[in-house]
Amino acid sequence: MDSNTVSSFQVDCFLWHVRKQVVDQELSDAPFLDRLRRDQRSLRGRGSTLGLDIKAATHVGKQIVEKILKEESDEALKMTMASTPASRYITDMTIEELSRNWFMLMPKQKVEGPLCIRMDQAIMEKNIMLKANFSVIFDRLETLVLLRAFTEEGAIVGEISPLPSFPGHTIEDVKNAIGVLIGGLEWNDNTVRVSKTLQRFAWGSSNENGGPPLTPKQKRKMARTARSKVRRDKMAD
């Protein structure tokens, strides 16, 4: 096992512990708590994959951080902070929408890279809006926290979330997963739109119809789906 992989995990465990203390002392806001919960799932998955105990890793991570801080000068710390771009947290969904439990009559789940896509195949002929909470850096989507698909009535019928065991994903991973979710929902004649906020930071533009600009790969995948459906309809006739 690579030593840098282990030390990175140990430091992440300790930093999560520090952030948890901030929450316990009621010094955090909703986005901070949201990221803490997401990172907890990620650390559990990484610990299982690496075969490392989180409590022991946290202790070692503390020693690593203390050593770095002891050697770090105040001036170097100021320069590092000044040169690091700050990310912003974007919220399409309210806390209630983000934390609400939902159920599927005909569940379907698909893993696309480091992201998990879930949708209810029982939903038909509905107008659906995709909304997401995510972080942004340099005006581009950085990290997806959670994406959900809502009907006009407010019911949740689909979701995209990061896999805890596969930390880290790119903007292309997110766009590909959105394309898969849209294709799955449109299979049952649903009309799917993407929030303007998500369009802006994921694609850098917005579509008046609410549809994101799809990649050639996504377009081919959706075209194959449409052709298969037409063939089935002809056979049924």
UniProtKB/Swiss-Prot annotation:
Region (PABPN1-binding): 223-230
UniProt-annotated location(s): Host nucleus; Host cytoplasm
GO molecular function: protein serine/threonine kinase inhibitor activity; RNA binding
Top-level lineage group: Viruses
Post-translational modification: Upon interferon induction, ISGylated via host HERC5; this results in the impairment of NS1 interaction with RNA targets due to its inability to form homodimers and to interact with host EIF2AK2/PKR.
Location of region: RNA-binding and homodimerization: 1-73
GO BP of this protein: symbiont-mediated suppression of host cytoplasmic pattern recognition receptor signaling pathway via inhibition of RIG-I activity; symbiont-mediated suppression of host gene expression; symbiont-mediated suppression of host mRNA processing; symbiont-mediated suppression of host PKR/eIFalpha signaling; symbiont-mediated suppression of host type I interferon-mediated signaling pathway
Gene Ontology cellular component annotations, sorted alphabetically: host cell cytoplasm; host cell nucleus
Sequence motif: Nuclear localization signal, positions: 34-38
HAMAP family associated with the record: INFV_NS1
Homology family: Belongs to the influenza A viruses NS1 family.
Protein name: Non-structural protein 1
Annotated source species: Influenza A virus (strain A/Hong Kong/5/1983 H3N2)
Encoding gene (name): NS
